Swiss-Prot record:
Function: Part of the ABC transporter complex NodIJ involved in the export of the nodulation factors (Nod factors), the bacterial signal molecules that induce symbiosis and subsequent nodulation induction. Nod factors are LCO (lipo-chitin oligosaccharide), a modified beta-1,4-linked N-acetylglucosamine oligosaccharide. This subunit is responsible for energy coupling to the transport system.
InterPro entries for this protein: AAA+_ATPase, ABC_transporter-like_ATP-bd, ABC_transporter-like_CS, ABC_transporter_ATP-binding, ABC_transptNodI, P-loop_NTPase
Membrane topology: Peripheral membrane protein
Any GO CC annotation of this UniProt entry: plasma membrane
Protein name: Nod factor export ATP-binding protein I
Gene (name only): nodI
Basic and acidic residues bias locations: 1-24
Biased composition (Polar residues): 25-34
Molecular-function annotations in GO: ATP binding; ATP hydrolysis activity; transmembrane transporter activity
SUBUNIT field: The complex is composed of two ATP-binding proteins (NodI) and two transmembrane proteins (NodJ).
Length: 340
C-alpha cells in the first residue's frame, strides 16, 4: 500500500499560516509573543466552572513557577481536563482569573497559545501522513514556513527517537512511538509551556518509562510542564509540585515527598485476606491511623513489627509493608482510593 504524500491541495493549504488565516489580517504569529521573563508561568485565582447545576471546578487557586513540572492529580471527574481547557482559553471560567505566560486568558488566549505546546490525552495525528509530514503541517498552525519547520524537524525527530521512522506513516508506529511523535509535534514552535493531559494513559510499562525519560529531558531544558494524571508513580517521579484535586477543589498542594511526610509520615502495612473490621482491635494500639478500603486494611505504623506480631498465627492473612506514597495521601484526604 502506497503512502499518502502531500498533494497540490495540501501544499496550497500550507502556503498561508493557519494563525494568519484565523486572525483575518491581524498581527502575525511572529510579531508578538507571550512574556518569557515572568517567574510565574500560570496563575489560577478563585476559578470556578459549572455545567448546569454541577460544579466542575470549585474556586480553584494555584500558581506554576517557570521551569517546574506541576501536576494536577485526581481521578476521572476531578476537573483536570476542564482546567486544561480553561488554561488554553477553550473554555471560559464562570468566575476567577487565569493568567498564562503573563497574558490574561481567555481574553488574550490566542497570544498565550503561541507559547504553549499541547499533548492531548488521545493522539490526533494524521494517520496517512508520514511522521515528517505531520510535523510539517503542524508547524503551519504557528505561522511557520516550510523552511522554518524543516530546520527544526531533524532535532525533533532525534528528541522523539524517530529518526529512522521519518518517512513512515503514523499508522505504522507503535503506541509509544505515536506518543513520542505527539510530544515532538507539541514542540514544533519551541513553546515555553507544555500542557500534557494524561500523557501515558494506555501505554505499556516500557513505553511509559520512555515518555518519562523524554519529559525529564524537557525539564532539563528549562521548559515548564503542566501534567494531568491519575498515575501516582508518574506524579511522584516527575512533578516538582502538585495539586491534589477532589471534585474540582484543591485539597492539598506541595512537593510529592512533602505531601507524603505531612499527611502520612510513616510506613504502611497493607493487610489482606481477613475481615478488616475484625482486625481493627488488634492493630489499632500500634498504628497512628487506620484506613479501610474494601477488603484491605491500611495500617500507618511507626513500628510495623508490632503490627506483624499481633497478627501472627492468623491463617489466610497476607501482609505487605511498603513506603508511604501519594495513593495513601489521597486515601487519607478523601477516604477513598484513586480510581481511573
Amino acid at each position: 500500500m502506497l503512502k499518502r504524500k502531500l498533494g497540490p491541495e495540501d501544499l496550497r493549504r500550507l502556503e498561508t499560516p493557519a494563525i494568519e488565516r484565523e486572525s483575518h489580517g491581524q498581527t502575525s504569529a511572529k510579531s508578538s509573543v507571550p512574556d518569557s521573563a515572568s517567574t510565574v508561568a500560570v496563575d489560577f485565582a478563585g476559578v470556578t466552572k459549572s455545567y448546569g447545576n454541577k460544579i466542575v471546578v470549585d474556586e480553584l487557586s494555584f500558581s506554576v513557577a517557570s521551569g517546574e513540572c506541576f501536576g494536577l492529580l485526581g481521578p476521572n471527574g476531578a476537573g483536570k481536563s476542564t482546567i486544561a481547557r480553561m488554561l488554553l482559553g477553550m473554555t471560559c471560567p464562570d468566575a476567577g482569573t487565569i493568567t498564562v505566560l503573563g497574558v490574561p486568558v481567555p481574553a488574550r488566549a490566542r497570544l498565550a497559545r503561541r507559547g504553549i505546546g499541547v499533548v492531548p490525552q488521545f493522539d490526533n495525528l494524521d494517520q496517512e501522513f508520514t511522521v515528517r509530514e505531520n510535523l510539517l503541517v503542524f508547524g503551519r498552525y504557528f505561522g511557520m514556513s516550510t523552511r522554518q519547520s524543516e530546520a527544526v524537524i531533524p532535532s525533533l525527530l532525534e528528541f522523539a527517537r524517530l529518526e529512522r521512522k521519518a518517512d513512515a506513516r503514523v499508522s505504522e508506529l507503535s503506541g509509544g512511538m505515536k506518543r513520542c511523535l505527539t510530544m515532538a509535534r507539541a514542540l514544533i514552535n519551541d513553546p515555553q509551556l507544555i500542557v500534557m493531559d494524561e500523557p501515558t494513559t494506555g501505554l505499556d510499562p516500557h513505553a511509559r518509562h520512555l515518555i518519562w525519560e523524554r519529559l525529564r529531558a524537557l525539564l532539563a531544558r528549562g521548559k515548564t510542564i503542566i501534567l494531568t494524571t491519575h498515575f501516582m508513580e508518574e506524579a511522584e517521579r516527575l512533578c516538582d509540585r502538585l495539586c491534589v484535586l477532589e471534585k474540582g477543589r484543591n485539597i492539598a498542594e506541595g512537593g510529592p515527598q512533602a505531601l507524603i511526610d505531612e499527611h502520612i509520615g510513616c510506613q504502611v502495612m497493607e493487610i489482606y485476606g481477613g475481615d478488616p473490621h475484625e482486625l481493627l482491635s488488634l492493630v489499632k494500639p500500634h498504628s497512628q491511623r487506620i484506613e479501610v478500603s474494601g477488603e484491605t486494611l491500611y495500617c500507618y505504623a511507626p513500628d510495623p513489627d508490632q503490627v506483624r506480631t499481633q497478627l501472627q498465627g492468623r491463617a489466610g492473612l497476607r501482609l505487605l509493608l511498603r513506603p508511604a506514597n501519594l495513593e495513601d495521601v489521597f486515601l487519607r484526604l478523601t477516604g477513598r482510593e484513586m480510581e481511573e
